[in-house]
Amino acid sequence: MNGGILTTNGKTFKKAVTKTAILLAISLHLLSFNFIQLRAFMSGLDQNTPRPIDIRLHQASKLLEIKFDNHTECMLSCEFLRVHSPSAEVRGHGAGQETLQIDKENVNISAIEPIGNYAVKLVFTDGHDTGLYSWDYLYYCGQHYEAMWQDYIAKLEMAGHKRIDQT
């Protein structure tokens, strides 16, 4: 390469190099843009989603208390978080591959591990530890707790299972 002009066997390929360089630059830009979009989606880094400022586990009552930076709070039961785990084990790898979680009334959280600055990994007493709970997913769960819980109860009943209330 000499001043942006490629020569091979005495021939100059300035136009080819320029077109190739432009196409390569555009391809790299699109690849970079798509990767950034995918990474933001996968990691739960929606900039508009409130972030937790305090996460407390109340083991006796089996509740996870989360306070967000927009002054909202939520209390999510360990059972709720377990049956709504964002893991592939629970959600599957595509639509229709979900696995209904049953007999999780007594589950508790044994550990909370931070994952970067975008999520936590919850370790449950039944051994489940593959779900990464992003900030936007936790916020979504807090905002839609009742609807998600009722949907879960309906799915249990449709599958012929009964939840044993532990109150």
In which residue ranges do the predicted regions lie?
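Residue-identity detector for glycine
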Residues: 3-4, 10
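Intrinsically disordered, low-complexity segments enriched in serine/threonine/proline/glycine
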Residues: 8-9, 15
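Positively charged N-terminal leader segments that act as targeting/secretion signals
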Residues: 14-25, 52
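Generic detector of N-terminal low-structure segments
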Residues: 15, 28, 35-37
